[in-house]
């Protein structure tokens, strides 16, 4: 399974990004819980979820900066 592409995130609306950030954080929590109880089978999901969360947070921050920067 390939890592998710940032182009997919850039197509999302601000509300969808915010919801996806919450979902990714929740999934990371659940993965950590599974790892602690030794029930985690797909360890690669950590990498994919962290990668996706980073993409979401990056695009969210880019949009915040674009809105706050006055155009010259």
UniProtKB/Swiss-Prot annotation:
GO CC terms: cytosolic large ribosomal subunit
Pfam families listed in its UniProt record: Ribosomal_L29
Molecular function via GO: structural constituent of ribosome
SUPFAM superfamilies in alphabetical order: Ribosomal protein L29 (L29p)
The keyword Ribosomal protein appears for this protein: yes
Domain of life: Bacteria
UniProtKB keywords: Ribonucleoprotein, Ribosomal protein
Keyword Zinc-finger on entry: no
GO BP annotation list: translation
Residue stretches spanning the membrane: none
Family, similarity comment: Belongs to the universal ribosomal protein uL29 family.
The protein's name in its UniProt record: Large ribosomal subunit protein uL29
Phylogenetic placement of the source organism: Bacteria, Bacillati, Cyanobacteriota, Cyanophyceae, Oscillatoriophycideae
Gene name in the database record: rpmC
